[in-house]
Amino acid sequence: GVLMDVGHGLHNLSFDVARKVLDQGLHPDSVSTDGHRGNRAGPVYDLPTTMAKLMALGFSLNQVIEMATANAAKLLGRSAEMGSLRVGHPAEISVLKIEDREWKAIDSQKGTIPAHQAITPVFAVRDNTIYEPLAAARP
């Protein structure tokens, strides 16, 4: 079968195209970003913002978390060591804040759709180290 990833980058996410694909019953298996210095101030911002954009397109919070964790690990062939929390395995944890607020989600072509929830990174934990989020502009 075909596996599909939403890899939001500077030039490759269109809400118009996404709606057409979703209307035909095709749904992404995972979500990722091409996050770098050139798109952290928009349109990509970060993975939590991209996840919130998918929520604005109709996906649930649980669906986008699964796309960003377990499904992404499976697509990389690494589900044995990442993508879930299990006893005896290393834990990499992102703590996210879900905010009920109105904002405009922006795609790579400057198209917008209304969004009703935002996902904000609070901190991450890896190898017993806490990491604060990078200071970045957010929509």
Segments from the language model and where they lie:
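Fold-independent oxyanion-binding glycine-rich loops
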Residues: 8-10, 34-35, 67, 98, ...
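His/Asp/Glu-enriched, well-ordered alpha-helical/loop segment
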Residues: 16-98
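A polyampholytic, Gly/Pro-enriched intrinsically disordered region
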Residues: 2-3, 56
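C-terminal cap of metal-dependent C-N hydrolases
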Residues: 90-138
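Glycine-centered flexibility motif
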Residues: 7, 42, 83, 109-111
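Structural preference for beta-strand elements that scaffold enzyme active sites
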Residues: 3-5, 30
